[in-house]
A protein has these predicted regions:
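Short solvent-exposed beta->alpha transition segments
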Residues: 35, 50-103, 108-110
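Sec-dependent bacterial lipoprotein signal peptides
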Residues: 1-23
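Exposed beta-sheet edge and beta->alpha loop/turn motif
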Residues: 95-156
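Generic recognition of cysteine residues
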Residues: 5, 22-25, 42, 106
Length: 156
């Protein structure tokens, strides 16, 4: 009877640990959230899927993405199809202390970049993009505004 009781406690402990482990897997850390958001955005952005990129963007970024989308033509899409999709990985990420802003540095391989002026497309085998993220209604969004002349971006 004593062995049975010990086995029961052991089973209960194992089940508790398993349940706790499963539950904790589902809760993403802020770090994981910002990195996944950055990857999702970059995969859409650098594969010219601007409607999906917009879903991960701040309201102020929408017009810039619409402008970029208007520069994408059939020749651009054909070249993208020939080369294959851009591949994205995270190099580093940082979240501010109050968990409202973050930045993620992504490496994008096999990418095309369309220059906003003139719509000329350039192939880049590897590039880095530093993304600024802000938390809006408990969701991390990318702030990708029109680059200013002095290199700074406008803010929401």
């Amino acid at each position: 009877s004593r062995i049975f009781c010990t086995m029961n406690k052991l089973h209960t402990l194992i089940y508790s640990v398993l349940i706790f482990t499963c539950l904790s897997c589902q809760q993403q850390t802020p770090q994981t959230q910002i990195e996944q958001t950055a990857i999702d955005f970059c995969e859409a952005f650098y594969n010219f899927n601007y409607p999906v990129a917009k879903e991960w963007s701040t309201p102020s970024s929408q017009s810039y993405l619409s402008f970029l989308a208007s520069n994408v033509g059939q020749p651009h899409l054909e070249q993208l199809k020939t080369r294959g999709a851009a591949k994205v990985s995270v190099i580093s990420s940082e979240i501010d202390a109050n968990l409202e802003e973050a930045s993620v540095v992504c490496q994008i391989k096999n990418a095309f970049v369309i220059h906003p002026i003139g719509g000329k497309m350039e192939y880049v085998s590897s590039l880095q993009d530093t993304l600024e993220l802000v938390r809006v209604n408990n969701k991390w969004l990318i702030r990708k505004d029109i680059p200013q002349q002095n290199g700074k971006q406008s803010h929401d």
